Amino acid sequence: MAKIILRHLIETPVRYQEEFEARGLEDCRLDHALYALPGPTIEDLRKARGTPKALAEDSDSAETPPGEGKSRFQILLDVVQFLPEDIIIQTFEGWLLIKAQHGTRMDEHGFISRSFTRQYKLPDGVETKDLSAILCHDGILVVEVKDPLETK
């Protein structure tokens, strides 16, 4: 098997490089897409994993599993380097601000400090109370707004 050249470490975190080499680039395209922001919805990923040609089909033709609402707005961020208390999520005048920063820490190469700030324009009519954020065990931060029709 030929080696795969990975050009962007933000899109392909180091911890996944061995998996990509073992499975091949084509098999990992959906996993790789998680790190392009704003990310695809979880429903799109589930549809695509079930049938490889699902990305080419119209999204309205696929059914949503029962009990699983559609998200109008969703962001996936890889924040594995940060502790939950290092992450700040704010809204301001229709914008979602996500900030994270940690002080100097020791790693395998020496000392490092990291920080980032991301801004996303919220859809019209979205209020702070409509947002939910989940930090998954694998270091992925999911911020989303559920469809208001789901609550009715």
Curated annotation (Swiss-Prot):
PROSITE patterns per UniProt: SHSP
Keyword terms: Cytoplasm, Nucleus, Stress response
Entry keyword annotation includes Cytoplasm: yes
Primary subcellular site in the record, as a coarse category: cytoplasm
Region: Disordered, residue numbers: 48-69
Domain sHSP, chain residue ranges per copy: 55-152
Superkingdom of source: Eukaryota
Cysteine disulfide partners in this protein: none
Compartment(s): Cytoplasm; Nucleus
Cytoplasm found in the keyword field: yes
One cellular component (GO) term of this entry: nuclear speck
Family: Belongs to the small heat shock protein (HSP20) family.
Primary role: Inhibitor of actin polymerization.
Protein name as annotated: Heat shock protein beta-3
Species: Rattus norvegicus (Rat)
Gene transcribed to yield this protein: Hspb3
